[in-house]
Amino acid sequence: MATHLTAAGRSARWRAGAAGAAALGLVLTGCGGAKVGGSEAGSGGSSGKCGTFNLAVNPWVGYEADAAVVAYVAEEKLGCTVKKKDLKEEIAWQGFGTGEVDAILENWGHDDLKKKYVEQQKTAVEAGPTGNKGVIGWYVPPWLAKEHPDITDWKNLDKYADKFRTSESGGKGQLLDGDPSYVTNDAALVKNLKLDFKVVYAGSETALIQAFRQAEAKKQWLLGYFYEPQWFLSEVPLAKVELPPYEAGCDADAEKVACDYPVYDLDKIVSKKFAGSGSPAYDLVKNFSWTNEDQNLVAKYIAVDKMSPEAAAEKWVKANPGKVDAWGK
């Protein structure tokens, strides 16, 4: 994590046109687990000072890119102390009520969690779109789509099921998913489309990427869950399998889903208390917006070029001053 900066003059200049310069009336929690409003946390003040900003980081590199850039700007421009917290998706939402999480930067739909935490518990509020379009689906390596072009139609998958068998798929074709915490309807899809496949979890985004990379290099049969935005698609342009078209409401019952995933307008979720705190970090989160291409570039810096998240963020921020300045207006 970058060092907490106290350059008040620089911070004030960047925030000059920002809304929400009101006093920070809420004390945020630190890593030690102090509750929201607790005396242990060290923020506060009477001039919109940032204090501690608790940022959830979900387990995929695109989100890591979001968090890297927002954290860098919060520290360099606003003088915040950013506490990044590596959390699975639903665990992060639980943190809104305890004061352990202020913001989630990339929410993929999750209408169920919005109902629970925004509508029912009222511990969270929506903070607008990220600008990213999220696509989830089933993919095969390019070589496979080229040699068997009909494989990109789900109706033909069973014809090739035996080719996808592995030691973990129990005599059925393997459908490889990533982290079990990701948004997925795949088990229901396999069941409801009556496919001779079994969902097997790679365990992480890194493992899923490596499986596709190896499948392309060694011409191995692989059908797997994947998504955009994702830098890896510029390295290996996976071919998407066409599932039954998505229609509004076709995924309303999770057990009966038999359609493709929707295109998600990814959005930001923050704690209700954070939204009303007057913290300039909230204004930054609310105004933060970029494209799939922006995210993929920073993610590539981290995953491929092996830059630290801080260095990757610094490189992108310095190359895109216009976009960054817009977040402070």
Question: Model-derived features: where do they sit?
Answer:
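An extracytoplasmic/periplasmic, membrane-proximal ligand-sensing/linker region
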Residues: 62, 182-198, 202-219, 280, ...
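Short, polar/charged alpha-helical segment
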Residues: 61-80, 190
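Ligand-binding pocket segment of bilobal, Venus flytrap-like solute-binding proteins
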Residues: 95, 101-108, 174-252
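A bilobed periplasmic-binding-protein/Venus flytrap-type ligand-binding module shared by bacterial periplasmic
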Residues: 136-146, 263-277, 300-301
